[in-house]
């Protein structure tokens, strides 16, 4: 049976997924709760990793070691970093990387890779589902760091250096982990704010709306994969 893993950082990012999946088995391993459901002949596992890269990497590796998924989807909300991307649009990662670490340390030392590519089939599936739902979507780079970006000045610096479509706090870590484990991966994020001076206010207003939208997209992806 095919196994699909879904990882989100916050309970709000997984609440709708869990409600739509219904009651299933829950296993607690290494401090993480893994929700396990059978859906359309596939095993779908979801976990709330907690915020930031260390939590995301730990949860991803524990999930891989214990459940051996065929692919990993990182879901949730993110800040928009490209002027074309609006609140409630979807960004599908083409690649992920940290914005708060000199990539020299990743490229010139293990794992000898600083930019982690997303899987083509997963990207295509996410884009197809967005089209089915009539949701505006973009493929592009997602960057991650250890802070919620809500400053015009910080946003501009990240834009100039990395030219990303979205910023979050976990995608790069999940992608890094999947790269090391040779697993197909994609991050599918719904924009909750523009990562600017108004970011915190926008996040509070659109968090639940954005989380529900991306949850519906990710669950539809599991049906097509």
Where are these regions (language model features)?
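Alpha-helix C-terminal capping segments
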Residues: 62-66, 80, 84-85, 176-184
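Proline-aspartate-enriched helix->loop->beta-strand connector
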Residues: 68-73
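N-terminal short beta-loop-beta anion/metal-coordinating cradle
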Residues: 1-67
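His/Asp/Glu-rich mid-to-C-terminal helical/loop segments that flank catalytic regions of hydrolases
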Residues: 195-225
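Generic non-transmembrane alpha-helical segments
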Residues: 20, 121-134, 161, 177, ...
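Mid-sequence, gly/pro-rich, charge-dense loop/helix-turn segments that line enzyme active sites
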Residues: 80-162
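A C-terminal functional module that forms or caps the active site or interfaces directly
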Residues: 148-195, 200
């Amino acid at each position: 049976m095919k196994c699909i893993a879904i990882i989100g950082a916050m309970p709000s990012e997984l609440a709708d997924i869990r409600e739509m999946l219904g009651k299933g088995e829950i296993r607690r391993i290494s401090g993480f709760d893994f929700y396990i459901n059978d859906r359309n002949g596939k095993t779908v596992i979801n976990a709330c990793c907690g915020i930031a890269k260390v939590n995301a990497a730990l949860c991803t590796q524990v999930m891989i070691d214990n459940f051996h998924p065929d692919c990993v989807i990182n879901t949730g909300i993110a800040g928009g970093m490209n002027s074309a991307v609006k609140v409630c649009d979807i960004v599908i990662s083409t690649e992920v990387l940290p914005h708060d670490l000199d990539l020299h340390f990743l490229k010139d030392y293990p794992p000898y890779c600083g930019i982690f590519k997303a899987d083509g089939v997963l990207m295509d599936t996410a884009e197809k589902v967005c089209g089915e739902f009539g949701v505006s979507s973009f493929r592009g780079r997602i960057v991650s760091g250890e802070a919620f970006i809500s400053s015009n000045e910080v946003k501009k610096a990240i834009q100039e250096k990395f030219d990303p479509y979205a910023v979050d706090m976990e995608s790069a870590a999940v992608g890094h982990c999947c790269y090391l484990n040779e697993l197909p991966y994609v991050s599918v994020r719904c924009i909750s704010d523009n990562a600017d001076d108004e970011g915190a206010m926008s996040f509070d207003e659109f968090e639940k709306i954005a989380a529900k939208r991306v949850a519906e997209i990710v669950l539809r992806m599991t049906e097509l994969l």
